[in-house]
């Protein structure tokens, strides 16, 4: 089953690029940050601290992260990923310097591998 999933994800790559391009044209994607969806980043982490990664897709999920953010941000690089522009805006407006925000990469093996190679999180937490 896992091999089928990987095959399908590779097969969908051209369509994912096309969808991202359409979203850019419609202004539904941040033109300065869309490459984050493919695992790239220009963001910097404090190399003295390990990374804790919290993923919250939407604003509603992100709002439930307050205790986690306040618990981890002083000790760790706190990487927050979201999938929507609204959640990204909310995260940066409300937590700014406490967090590092990046859009979550699309669920395609090479893009996730690139993301994980860059950030090397010690802990990953998904909010559902």
Q: Each predicted region: which residue ranges?
A:
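Short hydrophobic helices that act as membrane-entry/anchoring signals
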Residues: 2-24
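Active-site and donor-binding regions of nucleotide-sugar-utilizing enzymes
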Residues: 17-39, 43-128
């Amino acid at each position: 089953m896992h091999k089928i999933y990987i095959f399908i994800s590779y097969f969908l790559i051209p369509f994912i690029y096309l969808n991202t391009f359409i979203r850019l044209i419609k202004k539904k994607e941040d033109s300065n940050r869309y490459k984050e969806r493919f695992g790239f980043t220009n963001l910097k982490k404090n190399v003295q601290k390990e990374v804790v990664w919290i993923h919250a897709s939407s604003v509603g999920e992100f709002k439930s992260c307050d205790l986690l953010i306040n618990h981890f941000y002083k000790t760790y690089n706190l990487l927050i990923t979201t999938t929507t522009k609204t959640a990204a805006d909310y995260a940066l407006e409300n937590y700014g310097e406490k967090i590092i925000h990046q859009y979550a990469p699309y669920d395609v093996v090479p893009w996730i591998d690139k993301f994980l190679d860059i950030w090397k999180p010690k802990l990953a937490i998904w909010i559902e």
